[in-house]
Amino acid sequence: MAVDAADRREVIVKIDGENGNNNGVSGETVGKIWRDGSYDFWTDGEGNLNKGHNAAAVDSDRSAATTGEQQKDEGFEFRRGEDPPTKLIGQFLHKQQASGEICLDMDLGMDELQSRGLTPVSESPRVSTKRDPVGRRDSRSNTNNNDDGEVVKCSGNNAPIQRSSSTLLKMRTRSRLSDPPTPQLPPQTADMKSGRIPKSGQMKSGFFGKSPKTQGEEEEDDPFAAEDLPEEYRKDKLSLWIVLEWLSLILIIAGFVCTLAIPSLRKKKLWELQLWKWESMVLVLICGRLVSSWIVKIVVFFIERNFLLRKRVLYFVYGVRKAVQNCLWLGLVLLAWHFLFDEKVAKAANTKALRVVTKIFVCLLVGFLLWLVKTLLVKVLASSFHMSTYFDRIQESLFTQYVIETLSGPPLIEIQKNEEEEERISVEVKKFQNPGGVEIQSGAQKSPMKTGKSPFLSHVLSNGGGGGGENKGITIDSLHKLNPKNVSAWKMKRLMNIIRNGSLTTLDEQLQDPSLDDDKGNQIRSEFEAKLAARKIFHNVAKPGSKFIYANDIMRFLPDDEALKTLSLFEGASETNRISKSSLKNWVVNAFRERRALALTLNDTKTAVNRLHKMVNIVVGIIILVIWLIILGITSTKFLVVMSSQVVVVAFIFGNMCKIVFESIIYLFVIHPFDVGDRCEIDGVQMVVEEMNILTTVFLRFDNQKVVYPNSLLWTKSIGNYYRSPDMGDGIEFSIHITTPAEKIILIKQRITSYIEGKKDHWYPAPMIVFKDMESLNSVRIAVWPTHRMNHQDMGEKWARRSQLVEEIAKICRELDIEYRLYPLDINVRNLPTSTALPVSDRLPPNWSAPASGSN
């Protein structure tokens, strides 16, 4: 059959449940079938299409010449013979046709099913079914009589690629401060019962990592004695290089002793230098690094004995000990080289070679010294910056984490008191049961414990599983003792790792398999999950049927001092001594937001410090290279002139960039006006900090538009930070008529004040209400200036509270019959001018007809 290559038509697959007759395919269109995917239509063994209740018929477009001709039923297929996935899909289609179902899911990401060179028609990867009674485009005639059949439009597998690209685009443009998609609520959430505790098994959680101490063991008062030093520094690592150094030390010392003991070897000279001096030089060169490590360990040992030095200096000593070790080693080599080679030997030997070797040793020593100073400065500046900026926020966040997990678990304090009471009663019973009146010492007698402490409360805050070294957890008692003055650099680094790598979790009262480490179900990863956690905590802590959580309820879970501190964290709880559901929900949601923003801030700060470290490495490397050239004498006057001219050109090109980089670094690490998640106001526009970099800062505007500001530009602008502001005020203004009675005005003030003082968790008492201004001698503007018990970081909550206050003011005005009215105005008519004095016009609109001359 002749095939027209230029004729590209469309094939429509129709599923007809009533008519099993199949129309043939025109010979002119067999050679060029337009399709959008790789489909395998089920045929029988002879190539004909299967006929049944749901037979697939192919209705192709025909040209005007083929009018009314019906060809024989011929089956056709476009099949990939060697394609197993396509074959499986064909079998699946056949089974669905046999069962009467039409439900195809082509959301497969297989490369074998990609139709190359064809563009997808629909973005949806699923097969859609709809009726198409009308002819498709390019259809000149349609000979199929079954136009009411269902048309299955099969889209190819390029659609998943297009959808995945759009998904990646959404992931790339999604804000880091936004929540993941909110899941649907479970049909029934099992609330926790506070009165039960499992009899056995292990309760695991995401941030109670390591096992607590034994119940009888008391914690040390000094939390810095052992846990400040990471595990990697407590044990010496035995490497191959150290083994070779020890073997070389033993062999060289043995050779050195033999040389000095044997007279012939002692007098032997090599290159006008005695043999034992050469051996000493080799000993210092090979084993000097080992000796320098001993010196460093001795210094570290004496520093560890001093409490103040251990907290402040030891971190930096361990941080630069490799550089110090290398400097000591090269210093020993340079001293040995200088004193072993005297002037006679230098004259007898090649003087130029000795000088070059000496200069090389000096260059290496200077390079290591500069690198040591650079490393020490970067570590000191980074540590002091983190301590002064983030310590308070980290401590508060970890305490919040501890409170959330403790309140979501069993009531440990109540359980401990019940056990102590049962133990006391059992002792009394045994005392009365003893006929002689002699007290029997029993192993079950209560062991002495510190007041206010609980063996259950030796909680360990961790980043999800404990571990050693920098990931080791920290006890809550140690956290309370920390402050910016006594916290060590290692402790600060560990706290930062807990925040960066951990997350808020809840401790569900359920038994978990100790062999499983699946705590992700209890992690709070969105505001929706934070609200669910707040609901669980409320049902776990509050008494059955109660609408509030009282101080006594919290004291069942926490010691008295921690319970009072926890109570002060909630809005209005300090005055009422109770916590409502809304305040608990807001507190947990705000705790999640704060934890997320703090983790992002620490991540951005770490990235900025690492990039700054790389920049400093480049600068110090260039300085070391220039110093080496000067020491080695490679530079000459001509070379310096050429280099100076190049430096001038580079300074002209990159001078402004260097200035911008320097200003950005000072702005980010010294001024530091904001952190990630802070709501700021720049040029009258409120924005939230999305990301901090060395050169730029990314903000999110109120409509979620990302705005990138260069830090050098922010240097010149005034920035208002809502997050760092104290509790902020607000203002509401309204106008009343000047004739409003004074009694009503006094009543308005009293009712507004009573409403604000009744909302103790939202407003401070005694708002200021003043007559602000007078308008047109007929109205008075009254201003109400209350003060929120929050700053305006959460702008949505601020407007919600203000809206409630405005609604209350409107309600008060309506109840007091104070409404907006236009009072009558006095109009004095003195004298009306005569009609002759008024201007008279004979002009009429164009569609009006002029009156007759005789009409009045």
Curated annotation (Swiss-Prot):
Classify the main location. Answer: membrane
Q: Which SUPFAM superfamilies match?
A: Sm-like ribonucleoproteins
User: One GO CC annotation, please?
Assistant: plasmodesma
Annotated Basic and acidic residues bias: 70-85, 129-140
Per the record, membrane topology reads:
Multi-pass membrane protein
The residue ranges crossing the membrane are 242-262, 283-303, 323-343, 360-380, 615-635, 651-671
Q: What InterPro entries has UniProt attached to this entry?
A: LSM_dom_sf, MscS-like_plants/fungi, MscS_beta-dom_sf, MscS_channel_2nd
Query: Where does the record place Polar residues bias?
Result: 155-168
The protein's UniProt keywords, in alphabetical order, are: Ion channel, Ion transport, Membrane, Phosphoprotein, Transmembrane, Transmembrane helix, Transport
Q: Where is this region: Disordered?
A: 45-86, 116-226
Please list the disulfide bridges.
none
Q: Where is the composition biased (Acidic residues)?
A: 217-226
- Magnesium keyword on record: no
Q: Does the keyword Phosphoprotein apply?
A: yes
The places in or outside the cell where this protein is found are: Membrane
* Residues the record lists as Phosphoserine modifications: S211, S462
> What is an annotated GO biological process for this record, any one?
monoatomic ion transmembrane transport
What family classification does the UniProt entry report for this protein?
Answer: Belongs to the MscS (TC 1.A.23) family.
Role according to the record: Mechanosensitive channel that opens in response to stretch forces in the membrane lipid bilayer.
- Recorded protein name is Mechanosensitive ion channel protein 6
